[in-house]
Design a protein with these regions (language model features):
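Short, solvent-exposed beta-strand edge segments and adjacent coil->beta transition regions
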Residues: 97, 128, 327-329
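Active-site glycine/GP-rich loop and adjacent strand/helix microenvironment
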Residues: 2-14, 18-31, 35, 151-352
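Acidic/glycine-enriched edge-of-secondary-structure segments
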Residues: 95-109, 145-154, 175-179
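Generic structural marker for isolated residues within well-ordered, non-membrane alpha-helices
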Residues: 37, 87, 114, 145, ...
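Conserved ATP-dependent adenylate/AMP-binding module captured primarily in the ANL superfamily
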Residues: 111-128, 162-175
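Conserved AMP-binding loop of ANL adenylate-forming enzymes
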Residues: 119-155
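Short glycine-enriched loops at secondary-structure junctions
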Residues: 107, 134-136, 183-184
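Nucleotide 5′-phosphate-binding alpha/beta core
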Residues: 1-89, 94-112, 119-120, 125
Length: 352
């Protein structure tokens, strides 16, 4: 199932033209409304008129997490306060939280891309869906919530906590879909078993998991213990929240909503753009965001990008599984090692 075939199945030439137009509009918008970007572009001797197509994105400056912290709370905001209708924030555990303002159009885009994700997973308006991410400043809860409503399914805003009650609701209400972190899904499975229930006692069939790293081994365990199909859901608070990319039934990478979020892969060392298929740092430009648009935001996430039409019918670029972060890589005897690889090995050991 495809929510928006006009965008998700767009030809590459049409997508290139759309992205080019949106990038031109974005650059003009931030140049005139965000002093941070205007100063950066002037220092690089780049005028908005120099950006003629999406291919010119390499001329533009990067944005980093530190830039967001240095401009706390609202210096990167492009829309006037009167147009900001909601604010979310990151945890800020290592400094100032990242404050992200959303306009009404931003929220409409967010619910649209989340509806694409849920439809790709197989959720329909006939489903009852539990949103078990945290609500509040964290983007997970409300992001998934309004996507479910946009799709037309019934949303149960369970959030987190009181897991036994949650399981009873899943059983009694016939909840068929759930969005939560993969670690909470495993805790749900553990609690289900402690309550003396089996996976056959509940009706979960689809799970959307994200907001933290997880492995293929975790996917297999979640599917086996909860009796559902587990899908990856990717997003960042700085970019939008959940809904930036999503797996389809083929589960061969995650489709990026690239009409709204333009992806690049760069070398963390040289900052040069890398070709499709090469592993590097994932970078996003928010092509349509009004509240706090970002140019070439360095996510620090390491993955690959995969072009080409998918067997599901979608034509959007896919991103591979996140293998680690450019800021947590260890070099052991000349080999790059990521914590996620260690976790994968540990999970294969039965005693764990």
């Amino acid at each position: 199932m495809i929510w928006n075939p006009n965008k998700e199945c767009m030809s590459r030439d049409e997508m290139h033209a759309l992205q080019s137009k949106r990038l031109q509009n974005l650059v003009t918008y931030v140049y005139h409304n965000v002093p941070f970007y205007r100063n950066k572009m002037q220092a690089m001797d780049i005028a908005p008129e120099a950006i003629e197509s999406i291919d010119d994105i390499v001329k533009l400056p990067f944005t980093t997490k530190q830039d967001l912290r240095d401009n706390y709370p609202y210096s990167l905001q492009a829309a006037p306060p009167s147009e900001i209708v909601r604010v979310h924030a990151s945890s800020g555990t290592t400094g100032n939280p990242t404050i992200v303002g959303y306009t009404r159009k931003d929220l409409a885009v967010w619910s649209e891309v989340m509806a694409r994700c849920l439809t790709a997973y197989g959720i329909t308006r006939d489903d009852t869906f539990s949103v078990s991410y945290g609500y509040g400043l964290f983007t997970g809860g409300l992001g998934a919530h309004y996507g479910v409503e946009n799709l037309g399914a019934t949303v149960i805003p369970t959030s987190t906590g009181n897991t036994e009650k949650h399981i009873r609701l899943i059983r009694d209400l016939g909840i068929s879909g759930i969005a939560c972190t993969p670690s909470y899904a495993l805790y749900l499975a553990e609690t289900l078993e402690k309550m003396g229930l089996k996976r056959e006692d509940i009706s979960l069939r689809i799970g959307a998991f994200g907001a933290e790293p997880w492995t293929e081994n975790m996917r297999k365990e979640i599917e086996e213990r909860l009796g559902l199909k587990a899908y990856n859901l990717y997003g960042l608070s700085e970019i939008m929240g959940p809904g930036v990319s999503y797996e389809c039934s083929e589960q061969n990478g995650s489709h990026i909503c690239e009409d709204h979020f333009y992806p690049e892969i760069i070398s963390p060392d040289t900052l040069e753009q890398l070709p499709y298929g090469e592993q590097g740092e994932l970078v996003f430009t928010t092509l349509t965001k009004e509240g706090m648009p970002l140019l070439r935001y360095r996510t620090k996430d390491l993955c690959t990008l995969m072009p080409g039409e998918c067997a599901c019918g979608r034509t959007t670029v896919r991103m591979g599984r996140i293998v680690g972060r450019s800021d947590d890589m260890l070099i052991i005897r000349g080999i790059n090692v990521f914590p996620s690889q260690v976790e994968s090995v540990i999970l294969e050991m039965q005693e764990f």
